[in-house]
Structures are given as structure tokens and as C-alpha cells.
């Protein structure tokens, strides 16, 4: 499982700045998608080929008893309990405060690995700063400047070092597509899981991963193997009752990251909520294949169905790549078609795309609609090849590609997805410009 890094600390020590620094490499991928709402308290980051999840808690006051500060502290407590590593941010310019001491005492009792991060350390004597915060009793502090990026890469490498690389974890399993079933509480996720698995089929075993291992549950439907990625507590035999389900954003995000295909469950009786859109946005952000299951379809009338379709068209327009299915998890209606789309989305996400055909498709797109000029230069797209899968990544080489507008990128995405029938998976396009080595010479 990809490590979960939780940022804690009192207000105004730079948690949000560090969060943005840790997640910026992935944020840019979908920031321009129309209609996409984003919860800025969580995100994904990457260093080299290592992915990780980052959670930004609000200013943490462990002794707050009521009001909004108490609610913020309660939410931070849940994040701390589910963290693999805690980054305890303190302010190097302000020095150690009684509030820092209170948080440190709380974190010592939490039983999670903690790294003390001294932020705003630019221009300060690192040895003096480290000595001041060493007294917190949480190990040697690490000084950084989140605003300037100084020391951040070393911090991430230190944090990720104890965790196995992604390929080591994935090598431990070979049981078909990894499927995560996600959604907000009481939409029917547990009913769908039980319908897919059957009580007698639940076989749980730990995948090697972090200190809080995921559970992989293999199951078979229609003669095909699948693996359900479970981080939400489906660890015992028997039914998992929706009434006792406890929604956890972090566990949902972890399941999405571990999956090849995500099934997002919606409730036909309810309008699309911000939480639904946030989960869908994170699926897109991570590049996972997606199938949307509209549950309890049999329990609503035609008026409600029409209203829901309008609501989805407005709030989930950024999921145009995904298939939507009307199902009844309780009656097991629509399940076969749902799994067929899971198979199709997985196949699309893992597609091998030939370089000659990619290049021909790109050239046909340019002939139909050339990229707009930027200043005096018109971009020239020369050839394309595949750069990755799950999601498929297409790398385009050429000249003057640094300022391709987002609208043209989306045009290319649609063209490639239609040409290669990539239904069910998002697509990434990367541009590689051949820079003129003589451009800066007199």
C-alpha cells in the first residue's frame, strides 16, 4: 500500500505550503478539468517512481473541548490514527511554544512514526534550530523551507525509505484486476460487496505493505478472477452491514490508489453531493480506471431518475470517460453488465498502444485541427509513443510544445480515446520539446 503521510501542527506553521509542495507534481494534471471540485485537504504526490498520499489537517489543538476547534481536533485525531508517518510541523522563526509541547505529548502517545519538521528555516542556523526542537522528545528534527522547497526532497526520501517500492507490493498478488468499491456512507457499498463475494467466498489475507496492511480478497465471477482491495474493514467472514459502516476519507483514498479499477457507488434516491464529486475527482487525479454504479435504481420513479441524470450531467461532467450503470445491489440486478465494464476499463487502462498508430492518429488530429500559435511560433507535433499504463500515458515529441493550451490537450485526449477505444480509463498526455541548442547564442 502506498504510504499515507499526515501533516500536523498548530495553525500558521506552513502545513498548507508544505502540502502544496508535496503534491504539486500531480495537482497540475487535472487542475483545469471543467466541473471538477477538489477537496484541498488531501492529495497524491510522487518522488521518482514512488507515489504517496498526503493529508493536511487543520491547526491541531489536542486540548480543545468544544466548538469548531474541537471538531478540527477530532478530524485530526482520525487522520493521525490512520497515518503511516506523521510530519509534525513547527515554526523555526517563532521557536518552540507551549502549544508545540502539547501536540508533541499527544503524538508520543499516538504510537505512529513521527518526524519533526522545522519549517521557515531559511536564513537560520540549522544546528541552533534543531537543538531547540530536539527537546520535544520526538527524535532529530529536520529543517526545511516549504516556501522555497529547501530540504523537501530529502524529507520525502527519508519518510519513504522504510516502505517497499510499489512493484514489490504488486508482485505479491496475481489474481486479476484489483477493484475498489468506494462511495459515501449508506449508498449500498457493503451490499454490493456481499453480492459480489458471497458469504462463503470471503478469503482474506494480508498483502505485504505498510504497518497497516491492506486486505486483498480474491473472488470469481463468470469464470474470471478479481481481487477486491479492502481498506475499510471487511476482514471477517459474513456480511458487512451498511448500518455500522464508518466512512473514512483516508481509507477510501488508500483503496483508490491500490486499485486498477474503481467502482464509485451512487444512491439513485439522492442528489450528487460534494463528497461524491470529491471522490470522483480523486479517482481522476490518480488516473485510475472508473465505473460508476447507480445503486437502488429499482427503488425510484421516472421523475427521480430524470432528475438524477440531469444532476450527474452537471456535477460529474468530468467523468465522460467512464461508463455509468443502473444497478440494484440488493437484488443483484445489473451486476453482470457492471463487471463487464470493469473488465473493459481494466483492459483499456493496461492497453499497449503502437507507436506508428499513435503517430498516425496524432497527425490526423493535427490535420483536422492544428494547435494554435503561441506568439510567433506554432507548435509542431512530430511523433508520439506510449509512456506508461494504468492510466495510459502518451508522450508527444515536437517543437514549441511548452504552451499547448488545455483546450487542445483535451481535443487530443478525445481523439486518442476514440481511436483506441479507451472507454473507462482517463488518459494522460505529456509533451517533450526538442529545444534549439543555438537559441541563446549570438
Swiss-Prot record:
Could you tell me which SUPFAM superfamilies the record lists for this protein? P-loop containing nucleoside triphosphate hydrolases (SSF52540)
Recorded family membership? Belongs to the TRAFAC class TrmE-Era-EngA-EngB-Septin-like GTPase superfamily. EngA (Der) GTPase family.
Q: Which UniProt keywords apply?
A: GTP-binding, Nucleotide-binding, Repeat, Ribosome biogenesis
Q: Name one Pfam family in it.
A: KH_dom-like
Q: What is this protein's record name? A: GTPase Der
UniProt cross-references to PANTHER family, sorted A to Z: GTPASE DER (PTHR43834:SF6)
Named from the GO MF annotations, one term is: ATP hydrolysis activity
HAMAP family on file: GTPase_Der
Amino acid at each position: 500500500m502506498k504510504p499515507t503521510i499526515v501533516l500536523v501542527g498548530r495553525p500558521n506553521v506552513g502545513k498548507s505550503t508544505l502540502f502544496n509542495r508535496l503534491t504539486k507534481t500531480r495537482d497540475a494534471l487535472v487542475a483545469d478539468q471543467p466541473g471538477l471540485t477538489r477537496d484541498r485537504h488531501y492529495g497524491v504526490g510522487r518522488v521518482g517512481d514512488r507515489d504517496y498520499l498526503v493529508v493536511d489537517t487543520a491547526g491541531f489543538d489536542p486540548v480543545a473541548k468544544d466548538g469548531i476547534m474541537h471538531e478540527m481536533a477530532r478530524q485530526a485525531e482520525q487522520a493521525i490514527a490512520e497515518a503511516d508517518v506523521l510530519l509534525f510541523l513547527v515554526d523555526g522563526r517563532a521557536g518552540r511554544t507551549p502549544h508545540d509541547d502539547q501536540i508533541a505529548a499527544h503524538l508520543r502517545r499516538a504510537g505512529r512514526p513521527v518526524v519533526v519538521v522545522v519549517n521557515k528555516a531559511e536564513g537560520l542556523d540549522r544546528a541552533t534550530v534543531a537543538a531547540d526542537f530536539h527537546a520535544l522528545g520526538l527524535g532529530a528534527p529536520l529543517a526545511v523551507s516549504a516556501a522555497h522547497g529547501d530540504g523537501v526532497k530529502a524529507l520525502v526520501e527519508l519518510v519513504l525509505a522504510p516502505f517497499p517500492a510499489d512493484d514489490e507490493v504488486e508482485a505479491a498478488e496475481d489474481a486479476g484486476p484489483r477493484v475498489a468499491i468506494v462511495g459515501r456512507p449508506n449508498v449500498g457499498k457493503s451490499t454490493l460487496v456481499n453480492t459480489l463475494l458471497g458469504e462463503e467466498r470471503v478469503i482474506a489475507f494480508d498483502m505485504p505493505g505498510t504497518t497497516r496492511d491492506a486486505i486483498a480478497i480474491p473472488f470469481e465471477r463468470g469464470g474470471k478472477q478479481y481481487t477486491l482491495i479492502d481498506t475499510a474493514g471487511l476482514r471477517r467472514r459474513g456480511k458487512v452491514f451498511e448500518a455500522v459502516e464508518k466512512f473514512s476519507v483516508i481509507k477510501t483514498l488508500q483503496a483508490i490508489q491500490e486499485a486498477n479499477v474503481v467502482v464509485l457507488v451512487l444512491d439513485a434516491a439522492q442528489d450528487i453531493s460534494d463528497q461524491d464529486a470529491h471522490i470522483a475527482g480523486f479517482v481522476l487525479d490518480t488516473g485510475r480506471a472508473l465505473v460508476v454504479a447507480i445503486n437502488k435504481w429499482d427503488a425510484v420513479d421516472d421523475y427521480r431518475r430524470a432528475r438524477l441524470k440531469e444532476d450527474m450531467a452537471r456535477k460529474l461532467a468530468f467523468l465522460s470517460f467512464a461508463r455509468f450503470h443502473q444497478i440494484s445491489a440488493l437484488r443483484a440486478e445489473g451486476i453482470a453488465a457492471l463487471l463487464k465494464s470493469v473488465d473493459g476499463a481494466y483492459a483499456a487502462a493496461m492497453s499497449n498502444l503502437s507507436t506508428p498508430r499513435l503517430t498516425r492518429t496524432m497527425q490526423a488530429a493535427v490535420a483536422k485541427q492544428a494547435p494554435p500559435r503561441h506568439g510567433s511560433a506554432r507548435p509542431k507535433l512530430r511523433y508520439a509513443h506510449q509512456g506508461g499504463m494504468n492510466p495510459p500515458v502518451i508522450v508527444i515529441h515536437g517543437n514549441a510544445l511548452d504552451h499547448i493550451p488545455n483546450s487542445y490537450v483535451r481535443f487530443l485526449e478525445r481523439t486518442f480515446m476514440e481511436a483506441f477505444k479507451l472507454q473507462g480509463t482517463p488518459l494522460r498526455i505529456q509533451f517533450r520539446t526538442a529545444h534549439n541548442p543555438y537559441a541563446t547564442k549570438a
